[in-house]
UniProtKB/Swiss-Prot annotation:
It is found in: Cytoplasm. Component of the eukaryotic translation initiation factor 3 (eIF-3) complex. The eIF-3 complex appears to include tif32/eif3a, SPAC25G10.08/eif3b, tif33/eif3c, SPBC4C3.07/eif3f, tif35/eif3g and sum1/eif3i. This set of common subunits may also associate exclusively with either moe1/eif3d and int6/eif3e, or with SPAC821.05/eif3h and SPAC1751.03/eif3m. The eIF-3 complex may also include SPAC3A12.13c/eif3j. Interacts with sad1. Residues 52-73, 219-234 have a biased composition (Low complexity). Residues 1-110, 207-245 are annotated as: Disordered. GO terms for molecular function: rRNA binding; translation initiation factor activity. Component of the eukaryotic translation initiation factor 3 (eIF-3) complex, which is involved in protein synthesis of a specialized repertoire of mRNAs and, together with other initiation factors, stimulates binding of mRNA and methionyl-tRNAi to the 40S ribosome. The eIF-3 complex specifically targets and initiates translation of a subset of mRNAs involved in cell proliferation. Keywords: Cytoplasm, Initiation factor, Protein biosynthesis. Its main location: cytoplasm. This is Probable eukaryotic translation initiation factor 3 subunit J. It comes from Schizosaccharomyces pombe (strain 972 / ATCC 24843). Residues 82-110 have a biased composition (Basic and acidic residues). Belongs to the eIF-3 subunit J family. HAMAP family: eIF3j. GO terms for cellular component: eukaryotic 43S preinitiation complex; eukaryotic 48S preinitiation complex; eukaryotic translation initiation factor 3 complex; eukaryotic translation initiation factor 3 complex, eIF3m.
Length: 274
């Protein structure tokens, strides 16, 4: 038997409810959908992964930027080292060139000092430079003194002869002449050297004849005996040589004249040479 509840009359004041499919879907969509626990865990994991990916990308960007900075800094340091090495090489090359130039200049200065010293010694020997002048200025004064005219050379020749006049008998004079003459002749040409050789050969011949004559006279001349003051004996005595006789004096004067002539010839030859 049916119940009375099945036959209840609806309240006319209450609006009737109708089922609209679209309306239900819209209402259901507006309401939050209930989610299960495993779905929430998956969403959290996805969020974590996305955050990790974002952080990883950020770290990669930062690391790449830092690597770029490090690479640029490294290249800068390499360029600086290359520049420093090139600069050091340039300094070493300059120092080597300066050292080589200083060595050459020092060698040239040493050679010039030796030349100046030799010249100063020669000037001292010939007494050409003023005695009151300082020795440091002697070479400079010698350079300033120029021999141009024949009179200048004649005066220079007179100075030389005056200087060597009293030292011809010394032991070092022979070596001095042998060392000096070749140095004086180095600036002459072959023709002038032959003329000098001719004058020297003539002087050699004259010296040989003079020495030969002196040796013959020395061997033939008898030893001088003193004049006896005792009374002559009855027997015939041996003749004696009177060194004070006119003939002996004449022979001596002739020999002296010969020596003077030879010296004059030598002086004339020397004048012609100069």
């Amino acid at each position: 038997m049916d119940s009375w509840e099945d036959f209840l009359v609806e309240d006319p004041a209450k609006p009737a409810e109708f089922d609209f499919p679209l309306g239900k879907d819209s209402q259901s969509s507006s309401k939050p959908k209930k989610r299960f626990d495993d779905e929430e865990d998956e969403d959290e994991e996805e969020n974590k992964e996305s955050l990790q990916n974002d952080s990883h990308s950020v770290s990669q960007k930062s690391s790449s930027s830092s690597q770029n900075d490090q690479g640029s800094n490294k290249m800068t340091r390499i360029q600086q080292k290359i520049q420093e090495r090139n600069f050091e090489k340039a300094i070493k090359a300059s120092e080597a060139a300066a050292k080589e130039e200083s060595l050459e200049s020092s060698k040239e200065a040493m050679r010039q000092a030796e030349i100046d010293s030799d010249l100063a010694n020669a000037m001292d020997l010939f007494d050409i430079v003023d005695k009151n002048s300082a020795s440091a200025n002697r070479s400079k004064q010698a350079d300033q003194r120029q021999l141009k005219t024949k009179a200048d050379y004649a005066a220079f020749q007179a100075d030389i002869l005056k200087k060597v006049k009293n030292c011809q008998t010394t032991a070092e004079y022979n070596n001095f002449v042998q060392d000096l003459i070749p140095l004086l002749l180095t600036g002459l040409n072959a023709t002038n050297l032959k003329a000098v050789q001719k004058s020297v050969n003539k002087l050699v011949v004259n010296k040989e004849q003079q020495e030969k004559t002196q040796s013959k006279r020395g061997a033939a001349a008898p030893a001088a005996k003193p004049v006896s003051t005792a009374a002559p004996s009855k027997k015939g005595g041996k003749p004696t040589v009177n060194v004070n006789s006119k003939k002996t004096v004449a022979d001596k004067s002739a020999y002296e004249d010969y020596i003077e002539d030879e010296y004059d010839d030598y002086a004339d030859d020397f004048d012609d040479f100069m």
